[in-house]
Amino acid sequence: VYTALRQLGLGAGTPIRIAADDQGRMKPAALQDALAAADGPTIVCAQAGNVATGAFDEFEPIANACSSYDAWLHVDGAFGLWAAAAPATRHLTRGVERADSWAVDPHKWLNVPSDRAMAIVADPDTHIAAMSLAGPYLVADPGQRDNTNYVPESSRRARAVPVYAALRSLGRAGVAELIERNCAQARLMAERLTKISG
C-alpha cells in the first residue's frame, strides 16, 4: 500500500494505520472511529491472510463500517483469498464478498509462475472507468470485449494462461484439497517446531 501511494504521488504519510490485535487483524471499532473522523473519499484495505501471521481480518464488521461511511473496501488476498475455495477454511473469508475490490496472487498458492497477480473489481463499470485507454490507434470491435479496458497496460503477454491451466487441471475439488493439505502441513510444522528446545 505504501509503495503504491508513493508511486501515485500521494506520499507514504497519506494512510491512517488502524489499530490491530497481536496477530495483525484490524480492530473494527478502531476502523469505525477512523471512518467517522475521515474527511473525503476513503479506501479501507483489509487483509485475507496477514503475511506474517496468516490472520484474516473480520470482513463483516469492516464491510458494515465501510458501508456506513461510503468507503471503498479493498481486500488484499494475495494468498489468503484462496481459503474461500476450501470448505475447511472458507469461514475465514466470511463477508469478503462484500468488498469493492480484491487482489490475489495465484503464484502464492496455485504454484504457477510469479507475475500473475490479479485485481478484481466488483462493479465492471467502475473497473472500466479506471482502466480504459483512448487513442486513435486503439480500435475496439463493438461486438467484442476490449481487454485494454481491464489492465493498466495496452498490451501484455498472456499471463493468465498458467492460471487457467492450473485451475482447469485441479478443478474445484483439487484447489480445495491443495488448500486444506497445505494448511494441515503448516499446522504439523508448527506443532513440531514447538517441540524443539531453544
Where in the sequence are the language-model features?
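Active-site C-terminal subdomain of aminotransferase-like
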Residues: 50, 69, 85, 94-196
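Conserved PLP-enzyme active-site core in the AAT-like
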Residues: 1-128
